[in-house]
From Swiss-Prot:
Record-listed Zn(2+) binding positions: 114, 118, 124
EC supergroup of this enzyme: hydrolase
Swiss-Prot/TrEMBL GO biological process terms: rRNA processing
Pfam families: YbeY
Protein name as it appears in the record: Endoribonuclease YbeY
Main location: cytoplasm
């Protein structure tokens, strides 16, 4: 498993402990879904201005969001084992962590898991798809050791 991490923001320090938790969460998602972790993912931590621009350019939404997922074309991903890109806005993740009363590390791990399932082909546009994706997230988070309203160990 290869995870290319790029930190292009100054709102939160991406330390070794968080990096390890991120690697663990990505591996769990891959093993649960594909029974294989021989994939490459790009993960970028960005500022509000950068994620707003990406959201505007690729989704026609001129707003800050917490996370964006850019899966690669299925045929290309299968041939190369490249799944795609995850872009996280740390400032927005900090705000959400406060809102939900848990740590920023917990929020970032959740956002990584959520985004991984987008890279793996899931979505939450309609209710039935949302339920399927949410159950996948819950299963992965449980294996990681994150439960609703709790910190992970």
């Amino acid at each position: 498993m290869i995870i290319q991490i790029s930190n292009r923001q100054e709102d939160f320090q991406i330390d070794d402990e968080l990096t390890s938790d991120i690697e663990k969460s990505i591996r769990i998602c891959l093993l649960q879904e594909l029974n294989d972790d021989n994939y490459e993912i790009s993960l970028s931590f960005v500022s509000e201005s950068e994620i707003r621009k990406l959201n505007s350019d690729y989704r026609d939404k001129d707003s800050v969001t917490d996370v964006l997922s850019f899966p690669l074309d299925d045929d290309f991903a299968i041939q190369t084992n490249l799944l795609g890109d995850i872009i996280i806005c740390c400032k927005r993740a900090i705000e959400q962590a406060k809102e939900y009363n848990h740590s920023i590390k917990r929020e970032i791990v959740y956002l990584v898991v959520h985004s991984m399932f987008h890279l793996l082909g899931y979505d939450h546009i309609d209710e039935s798809d949302r339920i399927i994706m949410r159950n996948k997230e819950k299963s992965a988070l449980k294996e990681i050791g994150i439960y609703k309203d709790e910190e992970f160990k």
